[in-house]
C-alpha cells in the first residue's frame, strides 16, 4: 500500500471536522483516523495531567471541561485580538491577547497561553499519524486547504501550524478550487461551475471554468465570519431567551451550560435537515438560586421556525453569489453546474434558495464533508508527479495595494487577478529632501487606507536628498502559488537597487515556531511514556486477574507458603497499578508473575 514520497491532502476544518486524503492510483482516498472515522473533529482538549486529546476524545470532554477544550480555533488563526473580540465572547474558553496583541487561548490545564497555530498543529499531527498508519511509511509533506477569503497572514499562520506538526506544507490552496478538482472539472470540456462552499465557520463562492486539463478561477467572493456556527448561535440565542422568559436566568453566564447548548443546537440543526421537528432536551441545565433545585430545558423546534431564524443568513450567501457572478461577468443561466461543499449545504433552505436562484437543482454527487480533502489529495498527486495534465489558475480574493499621500490606498493588484502574479508601480517622495519612505501594505476594497487591513509596514532608507517628486521608488508585489505576498522596493534614482522583502508573518517568529515544535516533541515523548505506563499497568492487571483465578480454581492443591507468597505479589501489584508513575516498576513486577502457572491444570511449586 505504501507509495514513495506520498504527499497528503488535508482539509483543516474550522467549527466541525478535518479530513485527510491521499492519491492511491487514480483515486483520491479519504483516510480513517485512529478511532475509525473519516471525519476528525477539529477539537483539542488539555487534561489536568497536561495530556493533549485531539478529535473525538477531545470533543467528548467539551461539556465536562469547557475552559480547557478549544474548538473553532481557525476563526482566530492569524488574527489580532481586537479583530475577534466579539467572536471571543461566543466560545467557552478564554481568548486573550498575547504580548503582540495576537489572539491566543488561556488554557488553565496547559499552564500557558496556547496559540491558534498550536491547536491547528495538534489536529494536523493526528491526521499525519493516521495517514502514516494507512500508508505504512512516514509522511513529511502536505497540501492544506484554506477558505478563499483567508488573507496572507492567515495563510502564513496555517503554514506555521503545519511546520509545528512536522509537515512541510508544499502548497496552500483555496477550498472551492479543490472542490472543483474533486468534481472532475479538469476532465470536462468547456464547463462553467459555481462552487458554493458553506462550512462551519466560513462561506466562499467561486466561479470556475474548465476543460482539457485546465481549471481557471474566474471570480471568488466570501465571508470569513459566516458559517454553520452562526446558525448554531441563532438556535442557542433562541434557547437562552426562551429559558430566560420562563425562569428569569441567563444561561450565558454558565460556561458549562453554554457548551451543552452549543452541542444541542448543532444536533438540532442536523436533525432538522431530514426531520420537520426535533425536541431539545437538556436535563439539569442549571440550579435555581432561589430554591436550590435543578432546572431542565425542554423545547420543540420546527424546521419552519429554524428557517425563520436563519433566512437572513442564507440570503447573505445569495448576495455573495451575486457579487461573484458580477465579478465574473456572467449570469445565473451561464452556470452549468452548482457544486455544494460544506456540511451547512445539507440544510433544505440552502438547497431551496440555490434552486430558486439558478433555476436548477444543485449537484449532490459528492460528499460535502470530504470533497475538499479529496481535491487537495489530487493536487498533492499533481505535485508528487502521480497525476498529470492539470493546470490550475487561481485568483486573489481582495485588492492589494499601498498607502499613498493623503491616506489613500493605491491598488497594485486588483481583486480576482490570476495568481501567481507580479506587478509593480513607481512612486515618488511627498516632501522635499526626504531620505526615507514608508511602504504600508494594505488588503481590502475601500478607497481610504485606514478602512483596509494593514498587512505590513517597512521603511526604505538611504534615498539621496532631492526635491519632492524627483526620487523614483519602484514597489513590486509578488504573490506566489500559495497566495503568499512578498513586497520589494527599490530606489531607481541612483540606479543602485535597494530592496526590502516582506513576507507576511503569522504573528509567530521563527524562534517561537521552533519553541512550539520543541514543546510538541517534548509533549509527544511524555504522552508516549504515559501510554506505555498505562499499557504496562493493564498487563499487570491482567496478570493479577489470571493469577487470582488460577489460585481460586486450584484451591487446596496450592501449597500454603506458595499461596501466601502469590497473594503478597498480587497485593503489591494492585498497589502498583494504583500508584506507579515509573514503567520499570510495573515491568519488574510483571516478572514476578512468571513464577506462577497461568492455569490450575499446571502444578504449583
Curated annotation (Swiss-Prot):
CDD domains: ASKHA_NBD_HSP70_DnaK-like (cd10234). The modification Phosphothreonine is found at residue 202. Gene3D superfamilies: 3.30.420.40, Actin, Chain A, domain 4, Substrate Binding Domain Of DNAk, Chain A, domain 1. Induction: By stress conditions e.g. heat shock. GO terms for molecular function: ATP binding; ATP-dependent protein folding chaperone; unfolded protein binding. Belongs to the heat shock protein 70 family. This is Chaperone protein DnaK. It comes from Aquifex pyrophilus. The gene is dnaK.
